[in-house]
Regions:
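Short amphipathic alpha-helix that is part of the acyltransferase structural core
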Residues: 1-40, 50-61
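Beta-rich nucleic-acid/ligand-interaction surfaces
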Residues: 40-46, 151-155
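Short, solvent-exposed loop/turn elements at beta->coil junctions and helix N-caps
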Residues: 37-43, 168-173
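Short, His- and charge-rich active-site/binding loops that engage polyanionic ligands
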Residues: 56-96
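C-terminal non-catalytic accessory extensions
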Residues: 238-249
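Acyl-donor binding region in acyl/amide transferases
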Residues: 80-189
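A short helix-loop-beta-strand connector motif used in the catalytic cores of GNAT acetyltransferases and
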Residues: 44-53, 73-75
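Accessory, usually C-terminal, subdomains that scaffold auxiliary metal cofactors
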Residues: 163-227
Length: 249
């Protein structure tokens, strides 16, 4: 089967440049964030950033997720940012209160699909979610944190990617979004709940069954290349969950 798009985890070189262009286009349109503002916000996390992308046959990126891996010198942006306005919450204490292991918790920092990809928008969004969950499993992530625009949070919840607000936080304006919430989720119970209560989404988003037109790489290609000074724990796994091998669409 011919694929319109291919998925790449930890994009580099030309794909990385195209991913940044996609990120800038989406965030300017949705929230009014300029490229300079994005550079200022995410620059401290650059060495820890990992891009998951969906590219066409010309290597133009149509959809992307910027992840922040654990162990970087700047920490996780969500836990840093909730310490300031409008929340004023100690990120370390909030994380500790809900059992977040900082050595294996990742951040979903940005996520977007180009407007010109609207004909494939839903498919690309679902493929991004699949790549996110696959990358988390392969890299032994225990949890994730994010500050999600409430519309995006609702879309994730509709496919069983359910999140909770970090303690002491609530929906508030953030970086051009009129309503965003600092959230977290523990991956293993999230996937188990999805399997039980969102079985169709579990097959599509977690197992990747039915992602037609998107070439998904083998699981070992989701292994992130370790960054200097970071410890990515490969000892953990989700072996108690029937996630199975990820098929190629």
């Amino acid at each position: 089967m011919t694929s319109d798009f291919r998925m790449v985890f930890d994009a580099r070189d030309e794909l990385l440049a195209s991913a940044r262009e996609c990120e800038a286009e989406v965030f300017l349109r949705a929230f009014g964030n300029t490229r300079a503002q994005l550079d200022e916000e995410y620059g401290p996390y650059e060495d820890s950033s990992v891009f998951l992308v969906l590219a066409d046959q010309t290597d133009m990126v149509h959809a992307m997720v910027r992840l922040i891996a654990p162990g970087g010198p700047a920490g996780l942006k969500t836990l840093v940012d909730i310490g300031g306005a409008p929340w004023g919450v100690d990120g370390s204490r909030a994380a500790s209160a809900v059992g977040i292991d900082m050595t294996s918790t990742w951040e979903v920092a940005t996520l977007g699909v180009r407007r010109g990809s609207s004909a494939h928008g839903t498919r690309l969004s679902l493929a991004l979610y699949h790549g996110l969950l696959t990358g988390a499993r392969v890299n032994a992530a225990s949890s994730f944190v994010a500050i999600l625009d409430d519309r995006v949070r609702h879309l994730l919840g509709s496919v069983g990617i359910l999140t909770r607000a970090l303690p002491g936080t609530a929906s508030a304006p953030y970086l051009g979004s009129g309503s965003s919430t600092p959230v977290y989720a523990h991956f293993a119970p999230l996937v188990e709940n999805q399997r039980k209560n969102y079985p169709e989404a579990y097959r599509l988003v977690t197992l990747g069954i039915g992602l037609d037109g998107v070439a998904v790489p083998a699981p070992d290609e989701f292994k992130v290349r370790e960054r200097v000074g970071q410890h990515l724990d490969s000892a953990r796994d989700w072996s108690d969950l029937s996630v199975g091998r990820i098929p190629v669409a």
